[in-house]
């Protein structure tokens, strides 16, 4: 049976009336099942690795980690005295720090040694005591700094390090990374110069403690261990006799705080948003049933959407936050159109079922076109290289379908069931006939002016937005400025000379088909070039005061240099030397000498890294892997310390390192890849840009193809799509004017604009077409469209805008931005659908008539 004829509508209405109760029961059961799947509420994954696209570097890193320890992950701890203005380097504070460090080590030892290293002032002092104190005492055994220094200092002076680049580099790194900018070590120098007389206590307002966690752990394990460390240190810091306070930050902890606090905040915002929607629907329809039915239906649709994805085993990313407002926006639109048509049909029949079927019959083509086109537009996100964006597109498409089913079937069944049992409900929805007259008259007089204004605004938007919008991906953007983790991060940025310490890993492996790296002499030359380049790169940490620049990184090159400088006979045994800060070969060098030097270091348990307290063997194992027979180099890893506070700096660093790896591959005949958290962030940024451009273009293209296929008319299809594209450009221009950049949520605004824009445009076009087919002239058809569809769109768009505006109450910057930009997007989509599209449709009619 086809809808449209009175007989078929009456038969379907009879079936629908009988099925109303089963439909409501089935919807309720489906909602309960979906709701149970959402209990407890799912977490929104914010782990960096979940956003990153798969690259060749991932495969290379997997090969390397088969024979080498995985790169570590860092926890940053900002340590300040509990007493304001106190000295964090007082011996008592250092003793507590040593005790707390030991507690962390005990926790690590009880959990498979998940801590691989510490950068910690107390640890450095303990290493010095282990190496130089004849009695092998610990910090706790001393009462003053003078006693401690007496045990490790002989006849040294502060000036003794001059000329010792390694010592200066270590000290400079420690000062810039670990100690507050106000660090004062003059008392130590004066004490040394005065024959160990006086108080040598150095001073600083704060110190940094970096804990490096094993890279072998999964993200969940790493988070669990990070939380254990945070809980342990916070408990110890709140003890009555504690002299220190700890502020702890890491990407894992930031993700956890987002899941625990920000998403809870968002749930309340969404509930408030729904409350606002209820008030606006009540104002529009002035009927409890007209408010309750769509609200229940859309709540069910949201539960079906999220519940279905959970049952499929899909992990939600933070992007899925945006699904709810999109589904609500589209669902409200479907419901308002259907309910207004239902009101009109109800005046002509006593059967609520027949009235609902007739309302759907009138709107079925517009609704079907809208749902199919919008769903395909969202599915275009499958083109994205970022896995979460693929899932986001699928979730949105499912949400559109759920909203359609709930709005047409469930809401209709509720109306039929309620009116069947409780009697006829009074419907007095808002009417806008006078506004329709004014809008039509405006179009008749000013169509050309409107189109010219739109063209000018679009051109201005493009000009303003070109080069103005940056892409950002900072996990901390999802947290409010008043949250502890943000306060700690800001304090760290202000306190230390090296801000936002991060690392970039360079992985070097043999060419495909080769089992080892060959040409050790040439390899050393290439590594020397890299060492020189790193020394002059803007964002690479380079300690000051050395005779030759020594960038802060670890790898085979600085490893060999440090080993040779620490023991000249080591270099002689392997025909290697350090010449003016550069590692080179000496007489007698042959292929394999570098590998033999590495083999020796892999068995050396002496301290090889004073800052972290690692042995030569531990340090070497992290950076070099030999072939199974131990005679050649197989894999190399270089871990470079860099600073990057924002996405712009991240992109610049990634570009510099990419150029460097290209030169390295050409020079050494090897394969080189980049990895590390900073590169991960850059890959996400690049993926977001690509996704935004490709998905927008593809969404519009797919939408056009679907419309042409369904309508078999290219003219109207182009007319429908044009305002949607214009709305997208206007939104981008508005973002540029407001200073809002692309981030992981606002990047989705084009999907929202396309989804709602197509829906609005199809409703306007379809109603205009129906009115024309019924014999109305161009302007009468437009007036009728404004009176019916236009009024419905004003209600639905106004409701959606107010719902999004509630997000401005969020303390979270990116959610506020998303709420504002979404509201602007809906407003632009509405303006273009009601002011521009009617003029284009009228122009098309005149063109079709040969005028």
Task: Give the ranges of each region predicted by the language model.
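Interfacial segments of transmembrane alpha-helices in multi-pass membrane proteins
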Residues: 259-316, 367, 383-387, 694-740, ...
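Hydrophobic transmembrane alpha-helices
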Residues: 278-282, 298-299, 315-336, 379, ...
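Hydrophobic, glycine/alanine-rich multi-pass transmembrane helices and their short helix-loop junctions
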Residues: 280, 312, 368-418, 704-708, ...
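Feature of extramembrane
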Residues: 2-274, 278-289, 421-697, 846-851
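Hydrophobic alpha-helical transmembrane segments in multi-pass membrane proteins
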Residues: 22-30, 268-273, 277, 298, ...
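Short helical (or helix-break) motifs at transmembrane helix termini and adjacent helical loops
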Residues: 326-347, 367-369, 373-374, 404-411, ...
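Pore- and gate-forming transmembrane helices of large, multi-pass membrane proteins
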Residues: 257, 261-268, 295, 334, ...
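Feature of multi-pass inner-membrane transport and sensor proteins
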Residues: 1-2, 347-357, 407-437, 778, ...
């Amino acid at each position: 049976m086809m809808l449209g004829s009175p007989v078929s509508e009456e038969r379907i209405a009879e079936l629908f009336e009988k099925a109303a109760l089963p439909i409501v029961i089935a919807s309720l059961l489906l909602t309960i099942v979906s709701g149970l799947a959402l209990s407890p509420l799912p977490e929104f994954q914010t782990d960096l690795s979940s956003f990153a696209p798969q690259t060749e570097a991932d495969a290379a890193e997997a090969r390397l980690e088969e024979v080498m320890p995985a790169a570590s992950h860092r926890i940053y701890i900002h340590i300040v005295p509990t007493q304001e203005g106190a000295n964090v380097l007082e011996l008592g504070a250092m003793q507590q720090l040593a005790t707390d460090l030991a507690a962390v080590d005990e926790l690590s030892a009880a959990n498979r040694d998940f801590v691989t290293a510490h950068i910690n002032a107390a640890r450095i002092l303990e290493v010095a005591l282990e190496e130089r104190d004849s009695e092998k005492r610990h910090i706790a055994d001393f009462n003053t700094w003078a006693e401690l220094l007496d045990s490790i200092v002989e006849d040294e002076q502060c000036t003794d390090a001059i000329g010792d680049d390694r010592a200066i580099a270590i000290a400079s790194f420690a000062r810039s990374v670990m100690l507050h900018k106000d660090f004062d070590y003059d008392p130590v120098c004066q004490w040394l110069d005065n024959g160990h007389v006086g108080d040598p206590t150095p001073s600083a307002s704060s110190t940094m403690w970096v804990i490096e966690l094993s890279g072998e752990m999964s993200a969940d394990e790493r988070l669990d261990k990070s939380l254990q460390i945070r809980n342990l240190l916070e408990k110890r810091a709140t003890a009555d006799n504690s002299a220190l306070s700890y502020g702890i930050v890491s990407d894992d902890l930031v993700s956890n705080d987002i899941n625990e606090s920000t998403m809870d905040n968002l749930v309340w915002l969404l509930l408030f948003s729904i409350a606002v929607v209820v008030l606006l629907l009540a104002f529009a329809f002035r009927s409890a049933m007209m408010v309750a039915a769509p609200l229940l239906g859309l709540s069910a649709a949201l539960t079906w959407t999220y519940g279905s994805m959970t049952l499929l085993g899909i992990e939600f990313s933070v992007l899925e936050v945006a699904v709810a407002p999109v589904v609500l926006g589209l669902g409200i639109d479907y419901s308002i159109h259907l309910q207004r048509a239902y009101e009109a049909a109800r005046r002509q029949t006593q059967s609520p079922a027949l009235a609902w079927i007739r309302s759907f019959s009138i709107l079925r083509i517009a609704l079907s076109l809208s749902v199919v086109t919008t769903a395909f537009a969202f599915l275009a996100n499958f083109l994205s290289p970022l896995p979460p964006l693929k899932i986001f597109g699928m979730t949105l498409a499912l949400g559109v379908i759920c909203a359609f089913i709930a709005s047409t079937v469930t809401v209709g069944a509720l109306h039929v069931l309620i009116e069947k049992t409780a009697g006829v409900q009074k419907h007095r929805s808002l009417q806008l006939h006078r506004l329709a007259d004014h809008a039509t008259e405006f179009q008749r007089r000013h169509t050309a002016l409107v189109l010219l204004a739109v063209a000018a605004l679009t051109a201005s938007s493009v000009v303003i937005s070109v080069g103005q919008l940056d892409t950002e991906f900072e996990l901390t953007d999802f947290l409010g400025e008043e949250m502890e983790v943000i306060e700690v991060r800001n304090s760290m940025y202000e306190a230390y000379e090296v801000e936002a310490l991060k690392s970039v890993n360079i992985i070097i492996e043999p060419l495909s088909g080769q089992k080892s790296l060959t040409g050790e002499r040439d390899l050393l030359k290439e590594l020397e070039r890299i060492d020189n380049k790193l020394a002059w790169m803007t964002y690479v940490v380079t300690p000051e005061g050395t005779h030759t620049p020594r960038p802060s990184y670890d790898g085979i090159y600085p490893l060999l240099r440090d080993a040779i400088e620490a023991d000249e006979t080591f270099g002689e045994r392997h025909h290697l030397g350090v010449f003016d800060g550069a590692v080179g070969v000496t007489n007698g060098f042959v292929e394999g000498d570098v590998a033999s030097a590495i083999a020796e270091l892999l068995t050396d348990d002496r301290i090889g890294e004073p800052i972290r307290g690692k042995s030569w063997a531990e340090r070497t194992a992290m950076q070099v892997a030999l072939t199974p027979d131990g005679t050649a180099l197989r894999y190399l890893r270089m871990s470079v310390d860099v600073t990057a506070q924002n996405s712009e700096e991240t992109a610049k660093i990634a570009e510099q390192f990419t150029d460097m790896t290209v030169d390295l591959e050409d020079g050494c005949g090897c394969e080189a890849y980049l990895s590390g958290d900073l590169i991960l962030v850059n890959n996400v940024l690049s993926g977001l840009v690509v996704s935004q451009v490709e998905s927008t273009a593809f969404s519009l293209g797919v939408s056009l193809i679907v419309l042409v296929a369904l309508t078999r008319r290219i003219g109207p299809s182009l007319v429908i799509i044009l305002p949607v594209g214009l709305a997208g450009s206007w939104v981008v221009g508005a973002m540029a004017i407001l200073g809002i950049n692309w981030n992981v949520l606002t990047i989705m605004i084009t999907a929202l604009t396309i989804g709602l824009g197509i829906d609005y445009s199809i409703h306007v076009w379809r109603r205009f077409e129906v009115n024309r087919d019924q014999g109305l002239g161009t302007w009468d058809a437009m007036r009728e469209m404004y009176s019916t569809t236009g009024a419905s769109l004003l209600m639905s768009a106004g409701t959606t805008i107010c719902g999004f505006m509630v997000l401005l109450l969020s303390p979270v910057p990116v959610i506020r931005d998303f709420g504002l930009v979404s509201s602007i997007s809906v407003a632009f989509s509405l303006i273009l659908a009601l002011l521009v599209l009617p003029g284009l449709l009228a122009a098309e009619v005149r063109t079709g008539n040969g005028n």
